[in-house]
Amino acid sequence: MTTSTTTTTNIMLQVSNVTNHTLNSTEIYQLFEYTRFGVWLMCIVGTFLNMLVITTILYYRRKKKSPSDTYICNLAVADLLIVVGLPFFLEYAKHHPKLSREVVCSGLNACFYICLFAGVCFLINLSMDRYCVIVWGVELNRVRNNKRATCWVVIFWILAALMGMPHYLMYSHTNNECVGEFANETSGWFPVFLNTKVNICGYLAPIVLMAYTYNRMVRFIINYVGKWHMQTLHVLLVVVVSFASFWFPFNLALFLESIRLLSGTQNETLQTVITFCLYVGQFLAYVRACLNPGIYILVGTQMRKDMWTTLRVFACCCVKQEIPYQDIDIELQKDIQRRAKHTKRTHYDRKHAPMESGEEEFLL
């Protein structure tokens, strides 16, 4: 009985060590005290960029919105939840110290893992949608529509909430640590299962699927199409590379932690590496959520134009512009001329366009 009790105690200590370094609310709160200005600055920048993406899609692209736009919009929503969630949860912890740590523990884990799995689903569907447009073209236009994309989005959010449920329902704040509460029968293998699930479903599987679709699209464009779709591939390549790079330290730490749990060793050097990788990985995940819209701005030409147009429209709404009475006729004539030129240009582009009308997506 003594040996069994000692073994169970050792297993629970190992589980506590794992969960202590997975979004440890106490240690994150201590870091927040030193980097409070930087966290709020990144929150403001990330909120502005993600809201700009969402506004551009919902306002500027509302009439010609494509399934890709729907996935990008929800990806921005997932990033926005991560960006806004962290500083507000930590501010709540500062002003409500009695109940705050329990809320921070569950809240940060919920935002982090739900948005992680939801963002992965949206990235995969975004790559698959681009693959269908480039490789299959008009053959899948009946299947590929906004109603189906909206249904997929709802399914993905529900699936992300279910997949992330063990990460925030089974964690609680105990002895100033955010630890997992597992039964004795599952305390040995369930943390390893959670880490492996994140490694496979949240990192390896998306990279393999996105790399496969990207490879097929590149080969198809080089052999059969032309270079007008290369802008889309540039954006997708940057998105895939940034996803793999920013999430690598976090998933590496989970993988090393699973190995340490299975082997049962207590190596201080390995534990230090795991802790460092987890902190770096969580920081990079927050940075990526803030700067992910910048990828579309820097690489996507059409995205940059649409976002700039949205900014100008809202700037004109905020600043009242008055046209003198004698210039109204002149302005109307100029507007009629611009509309006529735009109609002729649109007719010419549709006639000589290298791709079917309606295939130019928000991502280009």
UniProtKB/Swiss-Prot annotation:
<feature type="topological domain" description="Intravirion">
    <location>
        <begin position="301"/>
        <end position="364"/>
    </location>
</feature>
<feature type="transmembrane region" description="Helical">
    <location>
        <begin position="280"/>
        <end position="300"/>
    </location>
</feature>
<dbReference type="GO" id="GO:0016493">
    <property type="term" value="F:C-C chemokine receptor activity"/>
</dbReference>
<feature type="topological domain" description="Virion surface">
    <location>
        <begin position="256"/>
        <end position="279"/>
    </location>
</feature>
<dbReference type="GO" id="GO:0007204">
    <property type="term" value="P:positive regulation of cytosolic calcium ion concentration"/>
</dbReference>
<keyword id="KW-0325">Glycoprotein</keyword>
<feature type="glycosylation site" description="N-linked (GlcNAc...) asparagine; by host">
    <location>
        <position position="20"/>
    </location>
</feature>
<dbReference type="GO" id="GO:0016020">
    <property type="term" value="C:membrane"/>
</dbReference>
<feature type="topological domain" description="Intravirion">
    <location>
        <begin position="210"/>
        <end position="234"/>
    </location>
</feature>
<feature type="transmembrane region" description="Helical">
    <location>
        <begin position="70"/>
        <end position="90"/>
    </location>
</feature>
<dbReference type="GO" id="GO:0060326">
    <property type="term" value="P:cell chemotaxis"/>
</dbReference>
<feature type="topological domain" description="Virion surface">
    <location>
        <begin position="172"/>
        <end position="188"/>
    </location>
</feature>
<dbReference type="InterPro" id="IPR017452">
    <property type="entry name" value="GPCR_Rhodpsn_7TM"/>
</dbReference>
<comment type="similarity">
    <text>Belongs to the G-protein coupled receptor 1 family.</text>
</comment>
<feature type="transmembrane region" description="Helical">
    <location>
        <begin position="37"/>
        <end position="57"/>
    </location>
</feature>
<keyword id="KW-1043">Host membrane</keyword>
<protein>
    <recommendedName>
        <fullName>Envelope glycoprotein US27</fullName>
    </recommendedName>
</protein>
<feature type="topological domain" description="Virion surface">
    <location>
        <begin position="91"/>
        <end position="103"/>
    </location>
</feature>
<dbReference type="GO" id="GO:0020002">
    <property type="term" value="C:host cell plasma membrane"/>
</dbReference>
<feature type="glycosylation site" description="N-linked (GlcNAc...) asparagine; by host">
    <location>
        <position position="17"/>
    </location>
</feature>
<keyword id="KW-0812">Transmembrane</keyword>
<feature type="topological domain" description="Intravirion">
    <location>
        <begin position="58"/>
        <end position="69"/>
    </location>
</feature>
<keyword id="KW-0472">Membrane</keyword>
<feature type="transmembrane region" description="Helical">
    <location>
        <begin position="104"/>
        <end position="124"/>
    </location>
</feature>
<dbReference type="GO" id="GO:0006955">
    <property type="term" value="P:immune response"/>
</dbReference>
<feature type="topological domain" description="Virion surface">
    <location>
        <begin position="1"/>
        <end position="36"/>
    </location>
</feature>
<dbReference type="GO" id="GO:0019031">
    <property type="term" value="C:viral envelope"/>
</dbReference>
<keyword id="KW-0675">Receptor</keyword>
<feature type="transmembrane region" description="Helical">
    <location>
        <begin position="189"/>
        <end position="209"/>
    </location>
</feature>
<dbReference type="GO" id="GO:0019722">
    <property type="term" value="P:calcium-mediated signaling"/>
</dbReference>
<feature type="transmembrane region" description="Helical">
    <location>
        <begin position="151"/>
        <end position="171"/>
    </location>
</feature>
<comment type="subunit">
    <text>Heterodimerizes with US28.</text>
</comment>
<keyword id="KW-0297">G-protein coupled receptor</keyword>
<keyword id="KW-1032">Host cell membrane</keyword>
<feature type="topological domain" description="Intravirion">
    <location>
        <begin position="125"/>
        <end position="150"/>
    </location>
</feature>
<comment type="function">
    <text>Plays an important role in spread of HCMV via the extracellular route. As a G-protein-coupled receptor (vGPCR), may activate signaling pathways important for virion assembly or egress processes.</text>
</comment>
<keyword id="KW-0807">Transducer</keyword>
<keyword id="KW-1133">Transmembrane helix</keyword>
<dbReference type="GO" id="GO:0019957">
    <property type="term" value="F:C-C chemokine binding"/>
</dbReference>
<keyword id="KW-0261">Viral envelope protein</keyword>
<feature type="region of interest" description="Disordered">
    <location>
        <begin position="344"/>
        <end position="364"/>
    </location>
</feature>
<dbReference type="InterPro" id="IPR000276">
    <property type="entry name" value="GPCR_Rhodpsn"/>
</dbReference>
